[in-house]
A protein has these predicted regions:
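Glycine-rich, acidic and aromatic/proline-enriched surface loops and short helix-turn segments
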Residues: 21-23
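Terminal, contiguous helix-loop blocks that mediate binding/assembly
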Residues: 2-14, 30-276
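A generic structural signal for short coil/turn motifs at secondary-structure boundaries
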Residues: 26-27
Length: 276
C-alpha cells in the first residue's frame, strides 16, 4: 500500500488539519517547512482519510488474511497501527519514519517479493533493499524499514503490560529516540520507551526478547539518519528497534492539540491491551 500516512493517528485529526491547511497556525505540528524536500505527503483524496482500524476491519470482513502487507508510506511501523493490523496479514513491512517521495526502490524490492522464481518471498531482503538504495544515494540518505511478525504482537502487548504494571520510573520523552522532526514528537522508539519505564531487569529482558521475535533483527534496517520535512534536516538515529510508539505524559493542559492526541491514543486497541 502506497500513500500518505500518519501511523496510528486518527483520520479526524488529519481532517481537521486539512480543513485549516490554508490558514495553519505557525505551531501546527504537521506544517511542512517551506522548501523542504518532499516525503510521501501527496495524493490526498480531497482531504478524505481512513483510520487504520477501519482498514483492518475491512480486511477482516473480506475473510482474507494476507501473507504480507508492505506499506510504502510514512510512519506505518507504528506499534499502535501494527497491532490494529495483527490479524490482517502474517507479516508487515513498514518504515517508522517518513519515506522520501521517491518511495521504495521497486526494481530491487519486487525481486525480493518473488524470490526463487516466485516460489517464496524474502521480506527481510525487501527491508534491506530499502536501506541499501537510500544509503547509496548522494543526498538524503534516509531509508528505514522493519519487518513485523504479526502473530507475535499480542505477546508483545502482554510484555509491555507487565512492564506498565510494575513501572517505577517516569519517562522523560526528550531523552528518547524520536522518528519525526516535529517540535513536539509523536513517534518514539518503542523498545527504548519500554526500557525507560522499568528498573526490573527481568521484565526488561523479557520485553527485548519478545521484540526480537516480533521484529527479527535480520529484518530491521536503517540509515545513520532520517530526513523529516517537518524540520527540513537530517536527524540522527542513535537507537533503532525499528518500531515506534506514542509516549504519553499525564496531561497536556497547556496544549489543546497534544491533549487531543493523548485522548485519541487512549482509545487505541494497543493502549487497552498494555495499560496497567
Amino acid at each position: 500500500l502506497a500513500s500518505h500516512a500518519k501511523g496510528w493517528l486518527p483520520a479526524s485529526i488529519e481532517s481537521s488539519s486539512w480543513l485549516r491547511s490554508s490558514t495553519r497556525r505557525a505551531d501546527d505540528l504537521w506544517r511542512k517547512i517551506p522548501g523542504a524536500a518532499e516525503t510521501r505527503w501527496f495524493g490526498q483524496d480531497r482531504g478524505r482519510y481512513m483510520d487504520i482500524s477501519e482498514l483492518a476491519a475491512a480486511i477482516d470482513n473480506s475473510g482474507v488474511r494476507f501473507d504480507y502487507l508492505l506499506f510504502d508510506a510514512c510512519f506505518m511501523s507504528s506499534v499502535e497501527a501494527l497491532y490494529d493490523l495483527r490479524r490482517a496479514a502474517d507479516y508487515i513491512v513498514a518504515s517508522p519514519c517518513e519515506v522520501m517521495a521517491h518511495g521504495f526502490p521497486y526494481d530491487t524490492v519486487i525481486p525480493s517479493l518473488f524470490a526463487d522464481d516466485g516460489a517464496r518471498y524474502d521480506l527481510a531482503a525487501a527491508c534491506r533493499n530499502v536501506y541499501e538504495y537510500y544509503n547509496a544515494v548522494d543526498s538524503y540518505k534516509s531509508g528505514c524499514a522493519t519487518l513485523t511478525v504479526c502473530d507475535e504482537l499480542e505477546r508483545l502487548a502482554t510484555a509491555l503490560h507487565d512492564i506498565n504494571a510494575g513501572a517505577t520510573k517516569a519517562v522523560v520523552a526528550s531523552t528518547l529516540q524520536s522518528y519525526d522532526g516535529m517540535e513536539t514528537h509523536q513517534f518514539y522508539d518503542l523498545e527504548e520507551y519500554a526500557l525507560a519505564l522499568t528498573a526490573d531487569d527481568a521484565r526488561g529482558q523479557a520485553f527485548v526478547q519478545q521484540m526480537e521475535r516480533c521484529f527479527p533483527p535480520e529484518g530491521r534496517f536503517h540509515t545513520a539518519q532520517f530526513f523529516s520535512m517537518y524540520n527540513n534536516r537530517m536527524n540522527d538515529i542513535r537507537y533503532y528497534s525499528g518500531v515506534t510508539t506514542y509516549a504519553p505524559v499525564e496531561t497536556y493542559s497547556d496544549d489543546e492539540q497534544q491533549q487531543t492526541y493523548l485522548n485519541e491514543w487512549q482509545q487505541t486497541a494497543w493502549y487497552a491491551a498494555t495499560k496497567r
